[in-house]
């Protein structure tokens, strides 16, 4: 199947979070190196290969978006710090169901008249089985990060 839109989760899919306390993840963050940002009681590490994967998808004219159950301000800050915020079209942040988030991404494409993408042209990647199952229910293809694929590099090979 030819996927036109790849939708990623963030936490434990494109980056990992280590927390030193039980507080919600929050900034401000500062970049420690190109893959690591430190905030108030947490360290966020962008998985190796994410930037390369995003560049390759862009070169192949694939649309890329996000569906993350995270604080929008935190997500935006981290995406900017890691230098990848421009890669994602119509990202969805907040506490909505992932199937709703993906549907909202598709609607945003239709609303601006840019593209009509069907759920069957979407690949959704998440680390949580219930999220993957919910998005599969709208007709999208899915991959469970950690089971179907174990790394960004493995995903890059699948998407070639």
PLM features per residue range, with description:
Residues 1-6, 29, 45, 86-89, ...:
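Asp-based, Mg2+/Mn2+-dependent phosphohydrolase catalytic module
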Residues 13, 20, 72, 130, ...:
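Conserved Rossmann-like nucleotide-cofactor binding loop
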Residues 82:
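Histidine/lysine/aspartate-rich catalytic loop segments that bind and position anionic ligands
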């Amino acid at each position: 199947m030819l996927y036109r839109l790849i939708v990623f989760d963030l936490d434990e899919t494109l980056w990992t979070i280590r927390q030193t306390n039980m507080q919600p993840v929050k900034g401000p963050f500062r970049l420690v190196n190109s893959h690591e940002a430190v905030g108030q009681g947490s360290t966020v590490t962008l998985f190796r290969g994410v930037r390369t994967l995003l560049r390759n998808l862009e070169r192949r004219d694939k649309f890329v978006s996000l569906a993350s159950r995270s604080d929008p301000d935190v997500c935006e800050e981290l995406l900017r710090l890691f230098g990848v915020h421009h890669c994602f079209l119509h990202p969805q942040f907040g506490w909505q169901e992932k199937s709703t988030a993906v549907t909202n991404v598709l609607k945003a494409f239709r609303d601006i008249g840019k593209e009509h993408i069907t759920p069957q042209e979407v690949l959704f990647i998440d680390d949580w089985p219930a999220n993957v199952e919910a998005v599969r229910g709208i007709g999208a293809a899915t991959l469970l990060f950690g089971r179907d694929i174990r790394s960004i590099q493995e995903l890059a090979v699948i998407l070639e």
